[in-house]
From Swiss-Prot:
ATP binds at G8, M9, S10, G11, S12, G13, K14, S15. GTP binds at D57, I58, R59, S60. Belongs to the RapZ-like family. Keywords: ATP-binding, GTP-binding, Nucleotide-binding. The keyword NADP does not apply. SUPFAM superfamilies: P-loop containing nucleoside triphosphate hydrolases (SSF52540). Displays ATPase and GTPase activities. This is Nucleotide-binding protein Rpic_0258. Coiled coil: none annotated. It comes from the Bacteria. One of its GO terms (molecular function) is GTP binding. It comes from Ralstonia pickettii (strain 12J).
Length: 297
């Protein structure tokens, strides 16, 4: 049986992921304590089911510590994949504000005057919500490492659905490569497996004609391709990824996220990410995401 275990931060998109699984024919259960998954899998297998999707989160926090043990047991008989969805605190606060829902760990009284809470209160933010989010992040951190992580902070719903569909795909392939451009001034992507810094490359930003463009526009491409340093770094990154890709495949990875960062995430990192994606598309499944441009492809 194929089992997809979804966990992660409240408000990060687990319901969207579970809906994608359900649309794909999975038998789906939300908020099931981990210790009950093996029994459910046995029952469903006896009934002829071949695909199971389970979401478990902080609402079942007493059973979260049993997840690694449960996954080990399940993998003796089933094909098990773990998916961990996360998002920045700022993004989660905004989502809760829009939906007006209460976080599972929110406390209304007796909040400590932590530095984060004092700063948040000065900005008029809900300190109980921020504290709950950070508490949840700490409690869930042991589950993030063994799972495939997706940071949904800037993802549109349709892009998240596309990633989930690729993640659960039954089509034979070794691994899916995600090349993600970003700007260091906005923070490093939390779901990156490899991070490359290209800030030392010549910057089109200082050309007033190129400044409003992106690394996908031909004038910027022409500028960067005329720089030997840019081509050399792109080749070095390509060679590194290609050399170590078999090791990630041998580690049973379904995804490998390669993040390319420049200062603002508009020119150099976008160009390098696109160049790498073009090369590796001939080798398998490739996705591209330009975080600061809010573009997925």
């Amino acid at each position: 049986m194929r089992i997809i275990l979804i966990t992660g931060m409240s408000g990060s998109g687990k319901s969207v992921a579970l809906n994608v699984l359900e649309d794909a024919g999975y038998y789906c259960v939300d908020n099931l304590p981990a210790q009950f998954i093996p029994e459910l899998a046995r029952y469903l297998a006896d009934q002829g089911y071949t695909h199971l999707g389970v979401a478990t989160d902080i609402r079942s926090r007493e059973s979260l510590r049993k997840v690694p043990e449960t996954v080990t047991v399940l993998r003796k008989e089933h094909d098990v994949r773990m998916l961990f969805l996360t998002a920045s605190t700022t993004a989660l606060v905004q989502r809760y504000s829009e939906t007006r829902r209460r976080h599972p760990l929110s406390i209304r009284n007796g909040r400590p005057d932590t530095a984060a809470n004092v700063q948040a209160a000065a900005k008029g933010l809900d300190t109980s919500l921020i504290e709950a989010i950070e508490m949840e992040r700490e409690l869930l951190s042991p589950l993030a490492d063994p799972a495939h992580r997706i940071d949904t902070s800037t993802l549109r719903t349709n892009a998240l659905r596309a990633y989930i569909k690729e993640f659960i795909s039954d089509e034979p392939h070794d691994i899916t490569l995600m090349f993600e451009s970003f700007g260091f001034k906005h923070g490093v992507p939390t779901d990156a497996d490899l991070v490359f810094d290209v800030r030392s490359l010549p910057n089109p930003y200082y050309d007033t004609q190129l400044r409003p463009l992106t690394g996908r526009d031909q004038p910027v491409i022409d500028f960067l391709q005329s720089q030997p340093m840019v081509l050399a770094m792109a080749e070095d990154i390509r060679a590194y990824v290609e050399k170590w890709l078999p090791s990630f495949i041998a580690d049973n990875r379904s995804y490998l996220t390669v993040a390319i960062g420049c200062t603002g995430g508009q020119h150099r990192s976008v160009y390098i990410a696109e160049r790498l994606a073009t090369y590796f598309r001939a080798h398998g499944n490739v996705l591209v995401r330009h975080r600061e441009l809010a573009v997925d492809g």
